[in-house]
């Protein structure tokens, strides 16, 4: 069981601000969550294998094939404006300054 003072400290640490009428609701909800966690902690699961996925399916594997993937010329064909040629040469997108 969690105390009301501990709930208020947790809210302060999380930088949560509550109106006076909602503090009691927060306290009740947090206490319920902590009680659920206590119930889960009581479960003996040392003989249970951890799940890697909720779906018990095998992934279809394929062989890796090396291919040419330099698509920069096609990518930079979409650049418009005065910086088209420079963008193709340096292989960067040139954008207006956004941070001063």
From Swiss-Prot:
GO BP: glutaminyl-tRNAGln biosynthesis via transamidation; regulation of translational fidelity; translation
The reaction(s) this protein catalyses: L-glutamyl-tRNA(Gln) + L-glutamine + ATP + H2O = L-glutaminyl-tRNA(Gln) + L-glutamate + ADP + phosphate + H(+); L-aspartyl-tRNA(Asn) + L-glutamine + ATP + H2O = L-asparaginyl-tRNA(Asn) + L-glutamate + ADP + phosphate + 2 H(+)
E.C. numbers: 6.3.5.-
Family: Belongs to the GatC family.
Coiled coil feature spans: none
InterPro entries assigned: Asp/Glu-ADT_sf_sub_c, GatC
PANTHER family tied to this protein: GLUTAMYL-TRNA(GLN) AMIDOTRANSFERASE SUBUNIT C, MITOCHONDRIAL
Keyword Nucleotide-binding belongs to the record: yes
Organism lineage string: Bacteria, Pseudomonadati, Pseudomonadota, Alphaproteobacteria, Rickettsiales
Listed name of the protein: Aspartyl/glutamyl-tRNA(Asn/Gln) amidotransferase subunit C
Alphabetically ordered keywords of this record: ATP-binding, Ligase, Nucleotide-binding, Protein biosynthesis
GO molecular function: asparaginyl-tRNA synthase (glutamine-hydrolyzing) activity; ATP binding; glutaminyl-tRNA synthase (glutamine-hydrolyzing) activity
Pfam families to which the protein is assigned, alphabetical: GatC (PF02686)
HAMAP family: GatC (MF_00122)
Role, per record: Allows the formation of correctly charged Asn-tRNA(Asn) or Gln-tRNA(Gln) through the transamidation of misacylated Asp-tRNA(Asn) or Glu-tRNA(Gln) in organisms which lack either or both of asparaginyl-tRNA or glutaminyl-tRNA synthetases. The reaction takes place in the presence of glutamine and ATP through an activated phospho-Asp-tRNA(Asn) or phospho-Glu-tRNA(Gln).
Subunit record text: Heterotrimer of A, B and C subunits.
């Amino acid at each position: 069981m969690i105390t009301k003072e501990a709930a208020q400290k947790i809210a302060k640490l999380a930088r949560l601000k509550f109106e006076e009428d909602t503090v009691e609701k927060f306290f009740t909800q947090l206490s319920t969550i902590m009680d659920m966690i206590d119930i889960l902690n009581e479960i003996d699961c040392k003989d249970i294998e951890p799940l890697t996925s909720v779906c018990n399916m095998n992934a279809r594997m394929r062989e890796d094939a090396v291919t040419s993937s330099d698509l920069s010329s096609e990518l930079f064909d979409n650049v418009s404006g005065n910086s088209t040629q420079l963008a193709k040469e340096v292989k960067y997108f040139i954008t207006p300054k956004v941070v001063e």
